[in-house]
Amino acid sequence: MEFLTDPWQWWVEPFTGDPLLQRAVLAGLLTVLVTSVVGTWVVLRGTTYLGEALGHGILPGVAAAYLLGGNPTAGALVAAAAMAVGVRGIQRRSPLPGESAIGLLLVGMLALTVVLVAAADEIDEHDLQEMLFGSLLRTSPADLLRQAALVGVAILVALVFHHALLVLTFDEVQARLMGMRPRLTELAFLLLVALSVTASFNAVGSLLVFAFLVAPPAAAAMLVRRVPAMMATSALIGTGSVLLGALLAHHLLGTPGHIHGGPSTGAGHTSPEEVAMPATMALVAVAVVLVVMVVRGVRNDSES
């Protein structure tokens, strides 16, 4: 019960004295910022499967970057852009239903990832864990700068296409009558999702970025109606999830200093505690969605 008997030490002190945890939280908050904006459109447009596909579709680019000795973020960006263009092309030309076509492309990208990983001696267990689960507790100042730059570009694109996305999402016929270009807006939306995934994967990994892209916006969509309010509410929920998730992982699983400096943690090895921190953040976000669903269901039952 230390969180009640000594609230300062439990709730605040972990964030004041450990630069590793501070950078981890900043990376998490940058992830929340971009996924709250982009994820709102993902939820409103009913394209959550697309977000999942793009989240996993970056893996071949990351694997290729490790294989060639390049920058994983650059590899992820190239793969995400290729995946976005590929999804758009398949949606336009394939006779298959939209989700089936996206699933086919996703399977191909995952298979390519397996081939690259199997063929590359340069990719070890540590690299594979970082690809899947991120490296939140190993975030460096340079990582934060790269992430902030990608987040800034994504937010700028979202601002430029905000009106077009708003009209196209709720009334495609009206968008055409207004002289808008739905194809260009659709491509911009795909690239926007690709940018948000690329900006977030280094922190939370390709498997968990989907949770941040969907969970806070989904909870916000059940609480408010207007798009800007949804984005703001999603950001608040995501921020709370990052902070509470970091605290839970810190108190229950160990401190970042122990993780990085302890004798049991060798170079190139990702400890379970490191993997667990972004997962704990995502788990809190999903828990918020479930709580909102239950509360809303109870309220609707009482009013009916």
What does each of the following model-derived ranges do?
Residues 40-123, 220-234, 247-256, 294-301:
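Short loop segments and helix-boundary regions at transmembrane helix junctions
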Residues 1-31:
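Membrane-interfacial amphipathic/re-entrant helices at transmembrane-helix boundaries
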Residues 25-27, 31, 143-216:
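Helix-loop-helix "hairpin" substructures at the membrane interface of multi-pass membrane proteins
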Residues 33, 55-59, 81, 107-108, ...:
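Hydrophobic alpha-helical segments embedded in the membrane of multi-pass proteins
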Residues 72-78, 99-103, 148, 208-209, ...:
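Loop-to-transmembrane alpha-helix initiation sites
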Residues 85, 89, 104-123, 135-147, ...:
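Mid-bilayer segments of alpha-helical transmembrane spans in multi-pass integral membrane proteins
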Residues 25-30, 73-78, 100-104, 144-149, ...:
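Hydrophobic alpha-helical transmembrane segments
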Residues 1-9, 120-132, 211, 260-267:
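Peri-membrane helix termini and adjoining interfacial loops of integral membrane proteins
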